[in-house]
Amino acid sequence: MYINNKIYHMSLLACMLSVLLISIFLPYTQNSAPRPQKADSVYSFISPQEEEQTTILIDAGHGGYDGGSTSWDERVNEKDVTLQIALKTGALLEDLGYRIVYSRTDDNVSWPQDNAADLQARVDLGVEEEADYFISFHLNATDFYNDGARGFETYVTPGNDTAKIASAIHEQLAQLDYSIDRGINEADYSSLHVLALNPVPAMLLELGFITDDADLAKLCDESFQEEMASAIAAGIQETVEQ
């Protein structure tokens, strides 16, 4: 009986010592255990805006019922040349990572045969597509053929960075040495609908004079159109993030 009682007390004492040791060392083992790391994504969060592509609306001037200006022999319509250069430029910009929306990709247009409604439909498309920029392609003209008027120029909307973009485009076009740089101008709101009534930052490129033989020869040359498109795309890439 004495032996059993002694064993009992020894067992009880051992149990109490075990509890005491656990209570002493457990906090240290908890503190020394590796803590779970926060996910990296908490620190490398990218906002939806940063993930979105920059959207550019490429507008080939005229089209369908509206041929635009014509060459002296009436064989070349402005609408055809602007479409060719606009499509080439858009394709290059898409390759660079921009989201491109076209006002037209052929000579079939969906808007009515009314100039004001036509231009407003192009503006509305830019708004609907949430475009960041609107770039309209055109050719210039005068009332008389080969009267000395030639060169490229751009009209921009004030109060945004379109002038900066246009300047970069002009620098690239000037390197082609195909005509005269006529400069960058703020839009005349009485006549340029796609700039005056456009909430999207917009510019209108006049790439040369269809009424000048030297300009026209370059504008109609397909290989030179590729060079021109590359120059325009390079100017945009230099100043507009994808």
PLM segments and residue spans:
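Catalytic-site microenvironment of enzymes
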Residues: 1-242
